[in-house]
Swiss-Prot record:
The keyword Membrane applies. It is found in: Cell membrane. This is Protocadherin alpha-10. Potential calcium-dependent cell-adhesion protein. May be involved in the establishment and maintenance of specific neuronal connections in the brain. GO terms for molecular function: calcium ion binding.
Amino acid sequence: MSCVAMKYCHESWCLLLSLLLFAIWEPGSGQLRYSVPEEAKHGTFVGRIAQDLGLELTELVPRLFRVASKDRGDLLEVNLQNGILFVNSRIDREELCGRSAECSIHLEVIVDRPLQVFHVEVEVRDINDNPPVFPTTEKNLFVSESRALDPHFSLEGASDADIGTNALLTYRLSPSEYFSLEVPTTDELVKPLQLVLKKPLDRERASELHLVVKATDGGKPELTGTLELHITVLDANDNAPAFDRAIYRVKLVENARNGTVVIRLNASDLDEGSNGQILYSFAADVSPKTEATFHIDSVSGEIKVNGKIDFEETNLWKIQAEAVDKGSPPMFGHCTILIEVLDINDNAPKIIVTSLSLPVQEDAPVGTVIALISVMDPDSTVNGQVTCSLSPHVPFKLVSTFKNYYSLVLDSALDRETTADYKVVVTARDGGSPALWATASVSVEVADVNDNAPAFAQSEYTVFVKENNPPGVHVFTVLAMDADAQENALVSYSLVERRVGERLLSSYVSVHAESGKVFALQPLDHEELELLQFQVTAKDAGVPALGSNVTLQVFVLDENDNAPTLLPHGAVGAGGAVSELVPRSVGSGHVVAKVRAVDADSGYNAWLSYELQFRAGSVRSPFRVGLYTGEISITRALDEADAPRQRLLVLVKDHGEPALTATATVLVSLVESNQAPKASSRVLGPAASESSVVDVNVYLIIAICAVSSLLVLTLVLYTALRCSALPTEVTCGPGKPMLVCSSAVGSWSYSQQRRQRVCSGEGPPKTDLMAFSPSVPPGLGSGDSGVQQEIFENPRQPNPDWRYSASLRAGMHSSVHLEEAGILRAGPGGPDQQWPTVSSATPEPEAGEVSPPVGAGVNSNSWTFKYGPGNPKQSGPGELPDKFIIPGSPAIISIRQEPANNQIDKSDFITFGKKEETKKKKKKKKGNKTQEKKEKGNSTTDNSDQ
């Protein structure tokens, strides 16, 4: 053997490594079988193992050829030079395998590069190397000379450690004229060898006889064993004790208590006196274990239990007993006691769990084997018959594969999110009475699979963002939960890309993949994009990944970032100023011109008001401008003191915070009456255009009066009843003037398609009252009137907890806070009913909010109604409220009678400017605001002040 082989084979770790590699790697194909006789000398040739395995001799050392054995590994060795398997040390078959019929040495041949494992079995052939052996080499017999012929003397037979023919024994007795040897042919356990007296003894001729019993096996060469018999011939006691039966068969229950009588032996002796007195004992060849378990009474012959009787250890006892008399010499009688141990159920079953496959995937199919379970019970018959069962309410079952072996299999689908692990209790119960049982617990862990998609708390979220936000501002955070575990629950977020107009959604917003935070990437413009609706996808990290979507509705709230824009006028002079010719003979109330303006914003930010700008120290101007109409009219009769040329500056202001303004210039030339035809020719154009607008407005007034008829009738009736108790009577007819106006905060600017005409309460119908409803759907006007009437008749304290719902707040681009809300009084000392004012912020902590009723026509430009003081102007005793609200419209209508000198300034009605629809046009107007102010003038419509 080479040094390399010696190095790997004589170190302890070499064997361990070889066994490990044997267990891991797939063995080579085929199996070699050799045979070698036992007791072969060192170096005995066994086989050319390298050649038989197909290995070259030159590759044995480089490939680390080595041999491992689970048995004694030093018995055989391989010469790495020639590849021959040879005997390395003494092989004793009896020591190696005992009396087993088959005896083999199993070798594992291992080579590396690549790793291969070969199985080699070497059969050890038995040789006749063990002679027959008697229990004793000498035996003394005492035979009376008076012994009758044909007596039998029992002899213990020999035993041979070999097997097969090598252990087949034949017996021969040395030549004797008195004795012969009788060899039993059947039932060796019952009948031992018998030495037969064939001729009466004559003590006087031979007092002693020496015979040799020779046992010869069947091997080649034959081996023998001898038993020397020393026979003493006695003179008297010629009758040996005799048992009534040669074989006694007894049944004994296991676990019998000590002292339990097993059997009482009965032997008789025909002799008299001491020759007939019998003593009982176990035979000399009884094992120490038998003597420790049983006790025989020498006088009575009773055999009693003296130790533990265990069926599982020994189920049959074979005891040789003898009876000897007190003669001289004593005579012996022999018998055999066969004690059969009866089993009782004294052993509980044992459960062994093997091949546990954990964890179990939650999507494992039904029938998947989880574990192999074996049970055993050392008892016999029904006491050893074991049945197994499982704890209830588990998705598993036991399937019997073969006797005492079960498979724990999946019986129904698993769901880790419902139950992550199971504690399965296996119960094994035998068939004894009473039955014994044992339990074993198997913990089954359920491994997660990606079977749950991330889920959002809501399918849709509504978000409000002010326009002109800084880039990168955090808008909202979406959160999705995943019921899975580990990476299957790791959620990432992304946008569902789409186009918004001509641009991609990702140019507007982005979402953080891990946190779900949504950011606005650029400033949003309410005028360009009021609603940005998109979807966010949440995906987990499982394979395959699962995901779900959530919809985000981002409403862009309006800010006052657009100044009012003047609309062009038909007669624009140099420098963009509007030129008008007015005869000096015209009376008070004559409309000179009208300034028109629009605001691209919405809501409160688009509510416009008009006012004249006067120079400091200037005389009282004969002109005024309608606060909400933009109409420039004459306040008194013109005289010679008035300058012939009047330059009027009209300031147009919205009501945003801060307010934005625009200025219009109107040049008014006063002409004499004889120049009126010329002036009329210059003004004829606008008057003709106004007449056409009057016709249109008449229809609008009729339409809105029809829609609001119920409300108007209610208001007229209520006002008539209230006015009858006041010093100054107010009616809605031509007799008593009733002023209908808005508060001093301005007008709404909406597209002209939304304007409606309403009827004023003073004189004949006019065309200067314009009321607007924020996107009121058709057919809802009468319902609003009914609600207003109920409030008048049965005032109630409002609920301060009313709030907008999220859907109504979604479109609040801005809201209007009318600080001068009217208070309706019932009379002196009567209860006050505060009317709701339109507000976007309620500074008073006690103020409440109320959502408009469903179906009231409120769209994204919704109002927030506030019940509270609102800093109102208190009315004196007996006075009517200053203003009230037309339902469905942001206009505040005043029904309070004012002195004649104040009616001029408070009889203006609101107008609405045209809202720009595109961002491109708004930016153009913002960039050229100063130039547009000069280019745009006033235009006169049919509307005139009241």
